[in-house]
């Protein structure tokens, strides 16, 4: 019976990093590195983890940990992100090696950049939030609202914006033990909100068009037509840029399917990974 346990890693420059890891480790299984979206903790992924650990070795890493290093490394965000994943892979205990990288929502740009650094053999991008600068790409109202909030960092009015949106947190009925509580976690206090928007701005500064075009890794791009948070146009656009991509658009798909236990998505992921594992063996 596989379960999730705490994994402590000591990275050369980033220092101590705390993740979640499924045990016992099975060398016959592929190892997935799952990135939680910006502003969320590992527990946000528990429904997905319950399914995935029955098929794969699993490591869950919080995007905030990664971006905190990239933000303080004294280099541009792209170089900081790339440096972190190199340290992370070097710190993994033998014989653990990342086979597939999973980016969901705002962690998709991180996963994309890591894949460009050769961090995985297969890549899965699920309902990605890419913050594309191309005005020709349709964006949802939610994406436009978030981008306006992101502007409060360079404009210096983050505190005023926080006061306006923090009511969403106070009106939330989710308890901290409920994984859905993570959706409004950045609204608990001003410092968390400022960090959340700073990290999103770092992601928005990445040259994703150039990065996607350079990714050689086979990639599954999954999006849901009923997603009210991220418009499928961004996922379709990224899929067109990737040299080796498979685009799946679920006509009934919702944004939170990955964390809500949507079996159709999990089976699509499993089939994709199994197919490419067989090709690698051949």
Swiss-Prot record:
InterPro entries: AB_hydrolase_1 (IPR000073), AB_hydrolase_fold (IPR029058)
Active site residues according to the UniProt entry: 105
Catalytic activity of the protein: holo-[CmaD peptidyl-carrier protein] + L-alloisoleucyl-[CmaA peptidyl-carrier protein] = L-alloisoleucyl-[CmaD peptidyl-carrier protein] + holo-[CmaA peptidyl-carrier protein]
Function recorded in the entry: Involved in the biosynthesis of the phytotoxin coronatine (COR). Catalyzes the transfer of the aminoacyl group covalently attached to the pantetheinyl arm of CmaA to the holo-pantetheinyl arm of CmaD. During the shuttling process, CmaE generates a covalent-aminoacyl-S-Cys enzyme intermediate by the action of its donor substrate L-aminoacyl-S-CmaA and delivers it to the sulfhydryl group attached to the phosphopantetheinyl arm on CmaD.
Listed EC numbers: 2.3.2.28
Resulting phenotype, residue 105 to A: Abolishes transferase activity
Note, other: In vitro, is able to accept L-Phe as a substrate when presented on CmaD and is able to load this aminoacyl moiety onto heterologous T domains. Thus, CmaE should be useful for shuttling different aminoacyl groups between T domains existing within heterologous nonribosomal peptide-synthetase (NRPS) assembly lines to generate natural product-like derivatives.
Gene3D superfamilies, alphabetized: alpha/beta hydrolase
Keywords: Acyltransferase, Plasmid, Transferase
Pfam families cross-referenced by the UniProt entry: Abhydrolase_1
Protein name: L-allo-isoleucyltransferase
Domain AB hydrolase-1: 169-261
Gene Ontology molecular function terms on file: acyltransferase activity
Family: Belongs to the AB hydrolase superfamily.
Highest taxon of source: Bacteria
Enzyme class: transferase
Gene designation per UniProt: cmaE
